[in-house]
């Protein structure tokens, strides 16, 4: 929390307080400039904070002017003094904090606090009463979204409840004692709290860190908590000295309000006095707070107001000097702008360009820098109880534990680290599913010996390529994949046993001499056989296929005398060996996986058929029993009986079926049955009348109910069938099948796959011995990964070339030459016009050439030092500082320049260079690729939030924890190669442009990879032993010398080849499936086209027939038309002839008529 101290960045707690009157005990007067942000005056800390309404400091991004805001609040307090005075006595339910400043104490009061030096304005101003003074802060950048609630806050509070392992702050914030940093708090202590909000927890606010504030009076604070009503009453102090007559209560209240309102501005305006400054130390939640003990001062009287004016004048003089300096700087800026008007115009245009360019690239929220590093050496060979407590504070240590040996240091030395990326996965079957092969292994044999136990931790890891893409955010990945990154600890998982609900345990058991062999301390294969047998019995996994068994850790317990299964076991030492086998060799091949899938499907079919047969058999038996009962108990209808002609046996059967007495003579039986038959006849007649009316309704209801029942039964059967099929279905990718032994551990055993991050998230409440073993293994595995990744980083730093300072020197020399040329030009008072023009042209040419050279140098620097444009948002703080430095250089050059043409050319050149750089950036964004993925994963494992950089102090701790015994000088020399502003931008080492895709891998067996270990005698002995072991790789097997190392290498090669072949086979199968789908689609389309062609041919035939018929009809019509025309022409001729003959006949008739007349 050092960044919250001093006067630069106030800490981010922003709670509002009501400041009226607060009473604090005397010992709370302490100088604490880191929390108040002002000078450590004699003024009481808690009363000053309460009077200012700032019981908790302001947030880090507090941008408002403190002086203006506090003066406005003081004025508002003075205006509301009269009204607030009445409310003080009429509203006792409000929380009122009494500020009893010892300005005018009651008569004969003992001054238990030091004297308070206040400004004169407090004594001379009119009485006022403080109203509620609150300080509003701007919303932090991370919480600008209005819809999201506040997830995290930092504040100061009081411990209200404290239990054995947890407590509460302000009755609302829950914290565990493991989160306390420094001194443990007591009930009533004021503490600094960093809390997070989680709505899914029982207590919404949970404290992540707790730190006790220094110099507190626990008795006084505790009394305030126990008696809150006393806070609202005026403090009565014993009388000792007669200082001044006590003012009336109203005047005293007004004076207190005046103090609380008027002391805001001088308190926070006063600068830190050099005489009162404390040495600056980095304080934080993770460090022990520096306690500053207030010096006791003699009791004295309050001096007249003239004493106050001195300190007020002193503060005013300091402020006036500061204002004079600010005004002087402003005048200098105005003079410089008046001397260069063109520069003023250029500066006025620059913000507009920024406003136009800003929407192109929105700034994203930079993630919080989170790095977790172990604070101890990672090559420790063993630990005892004290060392485990120091290393893992949240780890429960069993009472019988006394020693642990970390043998993974020898199993995975620095020269042969553990290789991630061996794909393996597990699939846990349901307890209903039976294994295909019967499991005959025994978990707890009768002769089990508790002196040795063997347990295994089985790894489930994705492939190396998948691990890179999911955790490293590669430069060539799409943005969705990069934003959804996961830490490698979330992707690396282990198969563990579960005893009960949340009790994880390693899979294994005790050694059996009869089943595993004798002498486990001498023969390492004995415990391996124990692990194979117990794992087979508990999970059904056959570990005999594993080729390498790494002895990861040995845990020893001192067991007292006990009774186990009726026999007394004397006191002994139990050694638990944790093995880490290469379980990925047990993964079934693709063909074996297909056979397993077929076997479980067949098992499901057999079970379904068996269940159906059982159901059918039960149904037949029920039907048969119902038929028999129906034959026996169903009486004959009354219309079919005639009691007078029935025999005695028949009469008795009918009476028994009607639950009537069958005893007596035949006449009695006949009379009894006849009477019953008459009753049945009458009832049936009545029922027939009712039945006719309700028969239809009942029939409909019965059908609907039967249909609903049938549908529900079918639906339940379908759901059950799908559920059972899902239990028997296997995933597409091959996995190791796990059948947990449900009868083991008193029927509470189960299996689960848990990630490394979940195993590391243990609690002190996990107080089981088997949970302790799993948690310890998780810590050791995490430390092994940290060591391997740290060595990878160290190896890369060793391979880097020394940093060249030649370019910096050239740049410096050219700047000096340029400055000298400018000075020579200024000394020339009266140059000739032509001469000046020619000199200006030369200068322009030189500047252009120099600008070109600068552009080349910038490009070279960009190619060498800043290739990661794709993740440039991660480096914005450092990039901003570099840009500020460049801007300062340009500003100095502009101040030195006096020619308008030079400024124009420079401005054009800068604009051209910026445009070119922006284009290059856009071009480089598309061309960045990650070439060193191993190194990127090493950095990402430590940089959990993917900030893109590691600070120098964290990188230094990483190198110190590797066990290489490096000196500080050696580490600093490594850092000079790559560090920039105390940080390492690791993307510069891992990413490069597409053109520079060639990457030289560093030699894993570097000469200096062991650091200074070779200089230590103890390490030399261990190295010699390891060389002897390496030379002893030949063994005699069946009369032949076998080189185990070469066999393992060949096995590894064959495994890689098999994996590649399976991958290719899978790819070919997928392609074949796609080709088959394509062929089927083509065949279907071909069939459709053939059908369409046939249909088209048929249509063409029909069209030809219709065409022929149409042609025949056309010819017929033509013949008919021809004949018609001929007939018409003949008729027309005849008509014409007739018409020609008719006129002569009429003329002859007319002449005859005229002659006769």
From Swiss-Prot:
One of its GO terms (biological process) is regulation of translation. Residues 300-341, 348-359, 685-694, 701-721, 804-824, 838-861, 897-926 have a biased composition (Basic and acidic residues). Residues 617-628, 862-896 have a biased composition (Acidic residues). One of its GO terms (cellular component) is perinuclear region of cytoplasm. It is found in: Cytoplasm, Perinuclear region. The modification Phosphoserine is found at residue 1157. Its main location: cytoplasm. Residues 643-677 form the SAP domain. Keywords: Activator, Cell cycle, Coiled coil, Cytoplasm, Phosphoprotein, Translation regulation. It comes from the Eukaryota. Residues 601-625, 1043-1128 form a coiled coil. Residues 289-365, 608-641, 685-721, 804-926 are annotated as: Disordered. It holds the Pfam family LAIKA. InterPro entries: BURAN, CCAR1/CCAR2, DBC1/CARP1_inactive_NUDIX_dom, EF-hand-dom_pair, LAIKA, S1-like_RNA-bd_dom, SAP_dom, SAP_dom_sf. Transcriptional coactivator for nuclear receptors which may play an important role in regulating cell growth and apoptosis. PANTHER family: CELL DIVISION CYCLE AND APOPTOSIS REGULATOR PROTEIN, CELL DIVISION CYCLE AND APOPTOSIS REGULATOR PROTEIN 1. This is Cell division cycle and apoptosis regulator protein 1. It comes from Xenopus laevis (African clawed frog).
């Amino acid at each position: 929390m050092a960044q919250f101290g001093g006067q630069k960045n106030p800490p981010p707690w922003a709670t509002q307080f009501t400041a009226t009157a607060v009473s604090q005990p005397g010992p709370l007067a302490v100088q604490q400039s880191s929390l108040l942000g002002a000078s450590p005056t004699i003024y009481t800390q808690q009363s000053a904070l309460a009077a200012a309404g700032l019981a908790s400091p302001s947030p880090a991004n507090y941008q408002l002017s403190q002086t203006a805001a506090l003066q406005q609040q003081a004025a508002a307090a003075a205006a509301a003094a009269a009204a607030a005075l009445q409310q003080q006595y009429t509203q006792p339910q409000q929380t009122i904090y009494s500020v009893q400043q010892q300005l005018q104490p009651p008569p004969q009061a003992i001054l238990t606090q030091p004297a308070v030096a206040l400004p004169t304005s407090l004594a001379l101003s009119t009485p006022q009463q403080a109203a509620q003074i609150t300080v509003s802060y701007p919303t932090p950048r991370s919480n600008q979204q209005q819809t999201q609630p506040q997830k995290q806050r930092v504040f100061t509070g009081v411990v209200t409840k404290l239990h054995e392992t947890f407590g509460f702050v302000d009755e609302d914030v829950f914290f565990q004692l493991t989160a306390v940093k420094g001194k443990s708090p007591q009930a009533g202590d004021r503490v600094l709290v960093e809390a997070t909000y989680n709505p899914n927890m029982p207590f919404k606010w949970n404290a992540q860190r707790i730190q006790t504030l220094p110099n507190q009076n626990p008795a006084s604070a505790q009394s305030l908590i126990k008696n809150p009503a006393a806070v609202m009453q005026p403090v009565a102090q014993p009388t000792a000295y007669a200082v001044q007559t006590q003012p009336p209560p109203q005047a005293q209240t007004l004076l207190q309000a005046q103090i609380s309102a008027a002391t805001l501005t001088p308190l926070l305006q006063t600068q830190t006095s050099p005489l009162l400054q404390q040495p600056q130390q980095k304080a934080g939640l993770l460090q022990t707070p520096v306690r500053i003990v207030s010096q006791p001062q003699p009791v004295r009287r309050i001096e007249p107001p003239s004493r106050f004016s001195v300190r007020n004048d002193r503060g005013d003089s300091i402020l006036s000097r500061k204002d004079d300096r600010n005004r002087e700087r402003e005048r200098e800026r105005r003079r410089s702008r008046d001397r260069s008007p063109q520069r003023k115009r250029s500066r006025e245009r620059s913000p507009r360009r920024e406003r136009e360019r800003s929407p192109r690239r929105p700034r994203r929220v930079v993630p919080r820098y989170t790095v977790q590093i172990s604070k101890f050496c990672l090559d420790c060979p063993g630990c005892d109880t004290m060392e485990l407590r120091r290393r893992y504070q949240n780890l429960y240590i069993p009472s019988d534990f006394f020693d642990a040996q970390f043998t993974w240091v020898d199993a995975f030395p620095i020269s042969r680290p553990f290789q991630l990326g061996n794909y393996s996965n597990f699939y846990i079957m349901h307890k209903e599913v039976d294994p295909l092969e019967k499991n005959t292994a025994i978990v707890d044999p009768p002769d089990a010996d508790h002196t040795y136990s063997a347990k295994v931790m089985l790894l489930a890891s994705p492939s190396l390529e998948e691990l890179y893409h999911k955790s490293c955010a590669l430069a060539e990945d799409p943005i969705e994949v990069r934003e959804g990154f996961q830490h490698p600890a979330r992707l690396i998982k282990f198969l563990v046993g579960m005893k009960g609900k949340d009790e994880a345990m390693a899979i294994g058991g005790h050694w059996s001499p009869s089943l595993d062999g004798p002498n486990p301390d001498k023969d390492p294969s004995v415990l391996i056989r124990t692990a194979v047998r117990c794992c087979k019995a508990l999970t059904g996994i056959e570990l005999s296929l594993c080729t390498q068994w790494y002895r990861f850790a040995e845990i020893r317990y001192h067991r007292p005398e006990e009774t186990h299964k009726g026999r007394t076991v004397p006191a002994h030492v139990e050694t638990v060996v944790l093995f880490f086998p290469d379980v990925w060799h047990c993964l079934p091949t693709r063909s074996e996986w297909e056979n397993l899938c077929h076997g479980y499907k067949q098992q499901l079919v057999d079970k379904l058929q068996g269940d159906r047969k059982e159901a059918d058999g039960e149904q037949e038996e029920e039907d048969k029993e119902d038929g028999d009962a129906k034959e026996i108990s169903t009486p004959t209808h009354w219309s079919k009986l005639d009691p007078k002609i029935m025999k005695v046996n028949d009469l008795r059967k009918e009476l028994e079926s009607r639950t009537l007495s069958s005893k007596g003579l035949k006449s009695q039986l006949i009379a009894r049955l006849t009477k019953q038959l008459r009753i049945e006849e009458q009832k049936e007649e009545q029922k027939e009348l009712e039945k006719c009316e309700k028969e239809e309704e009942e029939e409909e209801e019965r059908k609907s109910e039967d249909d609903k029942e049938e549908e529900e039964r079918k639906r339940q059967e379908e759901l059950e069938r799908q559920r059972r099929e899902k239990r028997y279905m296997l995933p597409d990718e091959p996995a190791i099948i796990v059948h947990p032994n449900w009868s083991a551990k008193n029927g509470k055993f189960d299996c689960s796959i848990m990630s490394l991050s979940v195993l590391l998230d243990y609690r002190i409440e996990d107080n089981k011995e088997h949970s302790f073993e799993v948690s310890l293994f998780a810590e050791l595995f995490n430390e092994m990964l940290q060591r391997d990744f740290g060595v990878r980083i160290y190896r890369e730093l060793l391979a880097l070339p020394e940093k060249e300072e030649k370019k910096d020197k050239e740049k410096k020399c050219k700047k000096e030459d340029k400055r000298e040329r400018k000075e020579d030009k200024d000394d020339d008072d009266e140059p000739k016009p032509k001469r000046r023009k020619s000199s200006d042209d030369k200068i322009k040419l030189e500047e252009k050439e120099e600008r070109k050279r600068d552009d080349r140098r910038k490009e070279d620097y960009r190619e060498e030092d800043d290739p990661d444009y794709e993740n440039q948002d991660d480096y914005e703080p450092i990039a901003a500082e570099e840009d500020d430095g460049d801007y300062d250089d340009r500003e100095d050059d502009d101040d030195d320049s006096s020619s308008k043409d030079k400024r124009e050319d420079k401005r054009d050149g800068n604009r051209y260079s910026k445009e070119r750089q922006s284009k290059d950036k856009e071009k480089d964004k598309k061309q960045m690729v990650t070439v060193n993925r191993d190194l990127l994963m090493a950095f990402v494992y430590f940089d959990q939030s993917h900030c893109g950089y590691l600070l120098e102090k964290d990188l230094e701790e990483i190198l110190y924890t590797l066990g290489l015994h490096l000196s500080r000088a050696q580490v600093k020399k490594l850092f000079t190669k790559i560090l920039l502003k105390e940080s390492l931008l690791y993307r510069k080492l891992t990413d490069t442009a597409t053109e520079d895709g060639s990457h030289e891998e560093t030699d894993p067996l570097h000469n200096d990879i062991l650091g200074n270990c070779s200089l230590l005698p103890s390490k030399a002995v261990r190295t010699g032993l390891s060389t002897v072991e390496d030379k002893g790789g030949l063994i005699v097997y069946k009369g032949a010398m076998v080189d185990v190392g070469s066999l393992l290498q060949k096995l590894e090669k064959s495994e890689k080849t098999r994996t590649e072949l399976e991958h290719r086979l899978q790819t070919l199968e997928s392609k074949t499936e796609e080709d088959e789908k394509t062929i089927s689609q083509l065949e279907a389309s071909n069939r459709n086209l053939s059908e369409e062609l046939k249909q088209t041919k048929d249509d063409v035939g029909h069209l030809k027939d219709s065409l022929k018929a149409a042609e025949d009809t056309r010819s017929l019509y033509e013949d008919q038309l021809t004949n018609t025309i001929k007939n018409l022409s003949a008729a027309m001729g005849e008509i014409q002839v007739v018409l020609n003959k008719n006129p002569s006949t009429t003329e002859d008739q007319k002449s005859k008529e005229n002659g006769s007349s």
